[in-house]
């Protein structure tokens, strides 16, 4: 039960009903004893926040980083992902490719963490949401209130 409480506490309290469904889905996955398959966009080798997020994703042993785009530079993104232990075929050149391929995989990601500058969050989040992949974004969702 403590893992369940940790999972609830680890996900911010959102008032929107859609986020409630995300919480329920992720919690049910934990109850089944399966790690949450996490994808990452951003947070590359020069990113301080990326390092922090990768460490924090291991704290409760509930997440497994299995896919990602870590740089705008395709070669750097793929090589860095492999140094993190991610399979070569799941290290992507861009977020669009990642969303498309992960959505088609039987064992695709359950959720993506966006660690890019705030002005790019909306377009990235929309792509993953369109593919029915949950999104975690800990910074402003958009660059302005209108968006």
Q: Where do the protein language model's features map onto the residues?
A:
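Beta-loop-alpha module in the N-terminal Rossmann-like domain of NAD(P)-dependent dehydrogenases
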Residues: 90-147
